[in-house]
Structures are given as structure tokens and as C-alpha cells.
């Protein structure tokens, strides 16, 4: 088509003569083909310089130049003009400083639009939501609020006695009336707070931290027994457990904004919590409801559409089993450490008696000092047993209960899904009933059937939204729970290792101090 176009233009008009060329040199340039080439090149100069050329002519002219490039290359003018389009395409992706600005402005944006944005868009859409969620969770976790539980005090006598704890709060949040305040709370108040929060938030998929478990034996000893070491140990364990429970409550952004939590922390007197006793009617009803829920959960077979929930539930169940095994081992370790402390104390007493009856002065003094060292070691073992319990055993016990609440959140999501499926099945039955009424030609009942269909369609839509909402909440709550769990375990393990290191350093210090006395025995 290039050669044909050149012949047509040569027949209609003659190209202007090139200055400085003689007829002999033109004839030696190659006959008719150079003339066609000359006419094409001259026509190109005319069209590129014209201001009325449309945008659709530029790519056509460019394609017409490509076949000419394979033609005669003996003319120097052809070589320059044939190389110029190649320079345009080669430089278009690198720089924009060329003479033909119109062609560059059309070609360069097309290549940048294809190459750059599609590479950045998927990454931003894929990773940005997770980053925002994590950043939001970090901001939510930074609360300037600290609660402390101190001064357990026995009030009353006999079986009507109870223990009141001083709950102190320090905060700069504008939610509260002052920066520091304190109230008195009994154990049933903590249980009542959990019941209120669980009733409001658990059905929406939130993980409400559970309170410490009841202990009938321990509390009975406190009520009717005298103030001995076992009662003091029980009260200290419960005080620490209540403090951890309340701190987890106020660390949760949703729970902190609940009016019941603020009332619990600020109000001087609370109404008596009902239904918190184990053997009460409400307590027995709760046990029955839990058993019913367990049976119904076994009958529900959910077709999980999101593999994340299925995998995460399996992880939670496996982790709960492993934590139970580890907790049993740590409790055994605590008991062994306490036995070691008792045996060390008996060993110290025996050494002291032996040293007092020894005639050799140096040996008697060495045995007496060894008995003192063993007494110090007995204190170290006792302290380490307490550290084993409060830093490891109690941490594992808390997270065993927390994992049970996490499983309950998954179960609540399953119940919401089952309610949605039941509504869909009911809607299908209503539609089938409407079809039967239409077939039987009963217009008097048809309007009622249509109203019921509209009602159940609205329910299906609402239950579907509820399922989507609780799925979002459970996912976010599990992510937050895992983050808090990692922080808790890190802090407790570091503290536990520091106590072990301190214990070993003290042991080395005691033995190094005693070694010269042992060497001085003659």
C-alpha cells in the first residue's frame, strides 16, 4: 500500500525539486522508485507540519512509514526519515524531550497507564484493611486506665459472712467523673457484672472475659474458720484473679464504654446481684441451659463458607487441650516446689540441732551456718513456688477459661447461621403454601399468605445481616484475643524467667558465702 500511495501522489502532483541536485544525480538515484519515495517523504513533511491533521491520521501515517523502511535506503533523506519513527518509539518510554510532541503525548500516557497502576492497586487493596485493623487495635489498646484490688476484708460472722475488696481506679479518661476513686465490692458483684456484660455482648460475638471460678470449700473455710495461712492464701489468690479479670474488662474498648462497667467502678453501693449462687434456682437454670445448648450444638451441621473460621476453631480447641495438659503439669510443679520448701526447712532444723550438739567448734559453727543457708534456700523455694503459681499456673487457668469463651463466640455465630437457615426454610414453605392457594383458587387466604411471605423475606434479610455482622465481630475479636494472648504470655514468661534467674543468683551467692566456712573446718 505504501508504493501504491506513492504512485497516486506522484501522478497528481510533482514534488518540488531539491536544491543543489542535478538531473544526472536524480537519474542515478534509482528511477521511479526513488521518485515515489521522494513524493512520500515530501507528503509526510507537509502533513506533519499542518495544523488541521486529526488524531486518527497520525497512527496511519506511522504505519505507512514502516514498509518504506524496508525499501530503498540509498537516498540519505529516506534514512533520516525512516529512523525518526524508530527513535520516537524507542524514546517514548524513557524521556519526553522529542520534537513530535503530539505523538509523544498520545503514546506515553498509554504505556504508563498499562504498566504502573495495575501493579500497585492489588497490593493496596489486599493489605491495607489488615494494616488499618491492626493499627486501630493498637490505638484501642492504649487506655490510660489502671484498676487495682486490695485489702480483702471479712464482713460478718458465720455462713452469712462475706469478703469485700477495695477496687481502686486511676484514669485520665473523660468517661469518668474523677481521675482516682475507690469503691468496695464483694465477689458476687464481680459475678453480677459478668452476667450483665455477657447477656448484652456475647450474643453479638464479643469475647467477654470470664471471672474466676467459685470455690465453695475455700470460701467456707474463710467464713467459718479462723484466720490461718490457708485462708490468707485463698484470699490472695482470689484477689489477684479478680484484679486480672477486671483489668481485662477495662482493656476491652467495647466493655469499657458499657454503663454497667462505669457504674461498677464508680458507684458507692450496688444492688445485690441475684442468681450468682451456685445452688440457687437461677444457677440451676443456667446449668440446664448450658446442657441444652451443648446438645443443640451437636445437632447443628454448618456448611462453612469461610475456611478461616473452621481452621481457627480447630486451633482454639487444640490449644485448649494443650493448655489443660500444661496446666496440670505446672500444678504438679508447684506442689513439688512447696514440698521441696518444706523438706528444706526440716533439713535446716536438723542441721541446727546437729550443730548445737557438736563438740568441734569449727564444725559446729559450719553446721549452724549451713542451717542458716538452708533456711534462706527454703524461702527461695517458697517464693519460687508462688511465682510458679501466680505467673504460670494462674495464667494458664485464665486462658483455659478464655478459650472456652472464644469457643462460645464461634457457637453463637453458628446459632445465628442456623436461625438464618431456618428462616429460609420457613420462607420456602410459605411460598409453597402460596402456590397451593393459587392452584386451589382461594383468594380469601392469598393475601394473608403474601403478607407472611413479605414478613419472612424481611426476616431472612435481617438474619443474613446478623450473620455477616457477627462473623465480622468474631473475626476481629479473635484477632484481638490472639494479640492480647501473645502480649500476656510474653510478659509473664519474661517475669518468670527473671524470678528463676534471681533465685539461681541468690543460691550462688549463699553458697559462695558459705564455702570459706566449710574450708575452715579443721
Swiss-Prot record:
<dbReference type="InterPro" id="IPR015404">
    <property type="entry name" value="Vps5_C"/>
</dbReference>
<comment type="function">
    <text>Involved in several stages of intracellular trafficking. Interacts with membranes containing phosphatidylinositol 3-phosphate (PtdIns(3P)) or phosphatidylinositol 3,5-bisphosphate (PtdIns(3,5)P2). Acts in part as component of the retromer membrane-deforming SNX-BAR subcomplex. The SNX-BAR retromer mediates retrograde transport of cargo proteins from endosomes to the trans-Golgi network (TGN) and is involved in endosome-to-plasma membrane transport for cargo protein recycling.</text>
</comment>
<dbReference type="GO" id="GO:0072673">
    <property type="term" value="P:lamellipodium morphogenesis"/>
</dbReference>
<comment type="subunit">
    <text>Predominantly forms heterodimers with BAR domain-containing sorting nexins SNX5, SNX6 and SNX32; can self-associate to form homodimers. The heterodimers are proposed to self-assemble into helical arrays on the membrane to stabilize and expand local membrane curvature underlying endosomal tubule formation.</text>
</comment>
<keyword id="KW-0446">Lipid-binding</keyword>
<dbReference type="Pfam" id="PF09325">
    <property type="entry name" value="Vps5"/>
</dbReference>
<feature type="modified residue" description="Phosphothreonine">
    <location>
        <position position="41"/>
    </location>
</feature>
<dbReference type="GO" id="GO:0030027">
    <property type="term" value="C:lamellipodium"/>
</dbReference>
<dbReference type="GO" id="GO:0005794">
    <property type="term" value="C:Golgi apparatus"/>
</dbReference>
<dbReference type="InterPro" id="IPR036871">
    <property type="entry name" value="PX_dom_sf"/>
</dbReference>
<feature type="binding site">
    <location>
        <position position="238"/>
    </location>
    <ligand>
        <name>a 1,2-diacyl-sn-glycero-3-phospho-(1D-myo-inositol-3-phosphate)</name>
    </ligand>
</feature>
<feature type="modified residue" description="N6-acetyllysine">
    <location>
        <position position="237"/>
    </location>
</feature>
<feature type="region of interest" description="Disordered">
    <location>
        <begin position="1"/>
        <end position="89"/>
    </location>
</feature>
<feature type="compositionally biased region" description="Acidic residues">
    <location>
        <begin position="35"/>
        <end position="45"/>
    </location>
</feature>
<keyword id="KW-0967">Endosome</keyword>
<protein>
    <recommendedName>
        <fullName>Sorting nexin-1</fullName>
    </recommendedName>
</protein>
<feature type="compositionally biased region" description="Polar residues">
    <location>
        <begin position="60"/>
        <end position="73"/>
    </location>
</feature>
<dbReference type="GO" id="GO:0031623">
    <property type="term" value="P:receptor internalization"/>
</dbReference>
<dbReference type="InterPro" id="IPR001683">
    <property type="entry name" value="PX_dom"/>
</dbReference>
<keyword id="KW-0007">Acetylation</keyword>
<keyword id="KW-0472">Membrane</keyword>
<dbReference type="GO" id="GO:0034498">
    <property type="term" value="P:early endosome to Golgi transport"/>
</dbReference>
<feature type="binding site">
    <location>
        <position position="188"/>
    </location>
    <ligand>
        <name>a 1,2-diacyl-sn-glycero-3-phospho-(1D-myo-inositol-3-phosphate)</name>
    </ligand>
</feature>
<dbReference type="GO" id="GO:0035091">
    <property type="term" value="F:phosphatidylinositol binding"/>
</dbReference>
<dbReference type="GO" id="GO:0005829">
    <property type="term" value="C:cytosol"/>
</dbReference>
<feature type="modified residue" description="Phosphoserine">
    <location>
        <position position="188"/>
    </location>
</feature>
<feature type="modified residue" description="Phosphoserine">
    <location>
        <position position="72"/>
    </location>
</feature>
<keyword id="KW-0813">Transport</keyword>
<feature type="modified residue" description="Phosphoserine">
    <location>
        <position position="280"/>
    </location>
</feature>
<dbReference type="InterPro" id="IPR027267">
    <property type="entry name" value="AH/BAR_dom_sf"/>
</dbReference>
<feature type="modified residue" description="Phosphoserine">
    <location>
        <position position="39"/>
    </location>
</feature>
<keyword id="KW-0597">Phosphoprotein</keyword>
<feature type="modified residue" description="Phosphoserine">
    <location>
        <position position="32"/>
    </location>
</feature>
<feature type="binding site">
    <location>
        <position position="214"/>
    </location>
    <ligand>
        <name>a 1,2-diacyl-sn-glycero-3-phospho-(1D-myo-inositol-3-phosphate)</name>
    </ligand>
</feature>
<dbReference type="GO" id="GO:0031901">
    <property type="term" value="C:early endosome membrane"/>
</dbReference>
<dbReference type="GO" id="GO:0006886">
    <property type="term" value="P:intracellular protein transport"/>
</dbReference>
<keyword id="KW-0966">Cell projection</keyword>
<feature type="domain" description="BAR">
    <location>
        <begin position="302"/>
        <end position="522"/>
    </location>
</feature>
<keyword id="KW-0333">Golgi apparatus</keyword>
<comment type="similarity">
    <text>Belongs to the sorting nexin family.</text>
</comment>
<feature type="compositionally biased region" description="Acidic residues">
    <location>
        <begin position="132"/>
        <end position="142"/>
    </location>
</feature>
<keyword id="KW-0653">Protein transport</keyword>
Amino acid at each position: 500500500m505504501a508504493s501504491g500511495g506513492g504512485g497516486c501522489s506522484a501522478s497528481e502532483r510533482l514534488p518540488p525539486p531539491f536544491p543543489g541536485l542535478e538531473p544526472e544525480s536524480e537519474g542515478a538515484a534509482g528511477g521511479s522508485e526513488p521518485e515515489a519515495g521522494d513524493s512520500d517523504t515530501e507528503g509526510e513533511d507537509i502533513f506533519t507540519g499542518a495544523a488541521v491533521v486529526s488524531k486518527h491520521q497520525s497512527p496511519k501515517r506511522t504505519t505507512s512509514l514502516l514498509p518504506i523502511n524496508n525499501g530503498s535506503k540509498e537516498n540519505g533523506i529516506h534514512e533520516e526519515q525512516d529512523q525518526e519513527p524508530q527513535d520516537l518509539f524507542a524514546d517514548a518510554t524513557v524521556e519526553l524531550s522529542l520534537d513530535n510532541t503530539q505523538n509523544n503525548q498520545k503514546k506515553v500516557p498509554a504505556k504508563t497507564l498499562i504498566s504502573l497502576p495495575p501493579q500497585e492497586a492489588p497490593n493496596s487493596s489486599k493489605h491495607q484493611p489488615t494494616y488499618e485493623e491492626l493499627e486501630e487495635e493498637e490505638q484501642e489498646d492504649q487506655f490510660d486506665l489502671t484498676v487495682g484490688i486490695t485489702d480483702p476484708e471479712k464482713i460478718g460472722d458465720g455462713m452469712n459472712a462475706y469478703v469485700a475488696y477495695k477496687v481502686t481506679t486511676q484514669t485520665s479518661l473523660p468517661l469518668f467523673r474523677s481521675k482516682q476513686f475507690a469503691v468496695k465490692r464483694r465477689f458476687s458483684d464481680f459475678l453480677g457484672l459478668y452476667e450483665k456484660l455477657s447477656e448484652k455482648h456475647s450474643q453479638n460475638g464479643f469475647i467477654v472475659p470470664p471471672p474466676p471460678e467459685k470455690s465453695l470449700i475455700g470460701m467456707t473455710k474463710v467464713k467459718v474458720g479462723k484466720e490461718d495461712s490457708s485462708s490468707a492464701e485463698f484470699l490472695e489468690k482470689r484477689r489477684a484473679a479478680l484484679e486480672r479479670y477486671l483489668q481485662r474488662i477495662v482493656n476491652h474498648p467495647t466493655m469499657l464504654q458499657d454503663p454497667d462497667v462505669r457504674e461498677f467502678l464508680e458507684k458507692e453501693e450496688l444492688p445485690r446481684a441475684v442468681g450468682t449462687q451456685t445452688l440457687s434456682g437461677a444457677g440451676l437454670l443456667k446449668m440446664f441451659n448450658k446442657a441444652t445448648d451443648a446438645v443443640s450444638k451437636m445437632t447443628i451441621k454448618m456448611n462453612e463458607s469461610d475456611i478461616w473460621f473452621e481452621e481457627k476453631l480447630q486451633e482454639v480447641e487444640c490449644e485448649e487441650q494443650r493448655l489443660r495438659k500444661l496446666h496440670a503439669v505446672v500444678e504438679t510443679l508447684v506442689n513439688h516446689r512447696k514440698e521441696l520448701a518444706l523438706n528444706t526447712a526440716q533439713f535446716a532444723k536438723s542441721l541446727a540441732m546437729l550443730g548445737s550438739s557438736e563438740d568441734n567448734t569449727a564444725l559446729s559453727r559450719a553446721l549452724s551456718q549451713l542451717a542458716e543457708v538452708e533456711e534462706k534456700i527454703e524461702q527461695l523455694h517458697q517464693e519460687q513456688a508462688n511465682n510458679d503459681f501466680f505467673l504460670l499456673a494462674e495464667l494458664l487457668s485464665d486462658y483455659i477459661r478464655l478459650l472456652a469463651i472464644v469457643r462460645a463466640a464461634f457457637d453463637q455465630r453458628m446459632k445465628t447461621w442456623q436461625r438464618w437457615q431456618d428462616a429460609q426454610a420457613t420462607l420456602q414453605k410459605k411460598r409453597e403454601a402460596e402456590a397451593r392457594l393459587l392452584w386451589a383458587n382461594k383468594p380469601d387466604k392469598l393475601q394473608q399468605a403474601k403478607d407472611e411471605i413479605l414478613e419472612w423475606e424481611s426476616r431472612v434479610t435481617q438474619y443474613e445481616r446478623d450473620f455477616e455482622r457477627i462473623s465480622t465481630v468474631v473475626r476481629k475479636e479473635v484477632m484481638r484475643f490472639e494479640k492480647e494472648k501473645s502480649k500476656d504470655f510474653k510478659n509473664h514468661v519474661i517475669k518468670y524467667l527473671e524470678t528463676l534467674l534471681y533465685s539461681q543468683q541468690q543460691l550462688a551467692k549463699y553458697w559462695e558465702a558459705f564455702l570459706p566456712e566449710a574450708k575452715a573446718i579443721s
